[in-house]
Amino acid sequence: IIVTEPSLWGIHDMQRVVELANHFNVPALVCVNKFDLNPNLTADIETFAREEGLTCLGRIPFDPAFTEAMVQGQTIFESNSNSRAGPAIKHIWQRLSFQLAL
């Protein structure tokens, strides 16, 4: 799973990982973290993924609750059951499970 963020560095790093995965013939999936910080670059990431034949599992919104959870040494689900990111992560997990036939 390639988790990227909508920034120039995020796109660059994602492209490098995709190139590496292609070189070694390793399947890859994409997930966009903090997608709502830059909708235009998020669209560019998703377009690139489609052009490369990659599945985009989903988008995770920016959520300050993540930092709070890390400080507490907990998952986002343990720390804040009403977080904005929680439903997105569950959706991505469901799609990943389907992709891997779990």
What are these regions (language model features)?
Residues I1-L8:
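Inter-motif core of Ras-like GTPase G domains
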Residues W9-D13:
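Short glycine/serine/threonine-rich phosphate/pyrophosphate-binding segments
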Residues L20-L102:
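C-terminal lobe/tail of nucleotide-utilizing enzymes
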